Amino acid sequence: MKEIKRNSWRAWLLAARPKTLAGAATPVLIGAALAYADGQFQWLPALVCFLFAGLMQIAANFINDLFDCLKGTDREDRLGPERACAQGWISPGAMKLGIIFTIIPACLIGSILLFYAGWQLILVGLLCVIFAFFYTTGPYPLCLLYTSDAADE
């Protein structure tokens, strides 16, 4: 087990799982490339999409970390990368706050896109938040529908 101070910046960085951010950035990059090829590329909406996708990926990682710990799925002796809540690096209460303080900025940043795409985008943002939770939580977690997690370390 790594020696990491409880609720430290290092603990939060490990909980954010930076290696998974490529999975959030790739579809945005593809969309930006398609917009560029069509002559419609704009820097601000592309940057906003990158920030929103990255924050939602981090929020999903925090949610996964918290609920797997609470359900006992992730334990201190788990195989694979260590998880922050299971290791005691971040308390469940602090992780709940981390989820809130990641989703709220994601939604505020994402709301800039309403000026480009209209109010219908609110539904897309809402679905992003819902599926971030349903990946790990609920009666039929999405993470259990597949045999592997390609984006995980």
PLM ranges: what are they?
Residues Y36-F41, L66, L70, W119, ...:
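Membrane-interface elements of multi-pass transporters and channels
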Residues L55-L79:
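Acidic (Asp/Glu-rich) catalytic motifs at the cytosolic membrane interface
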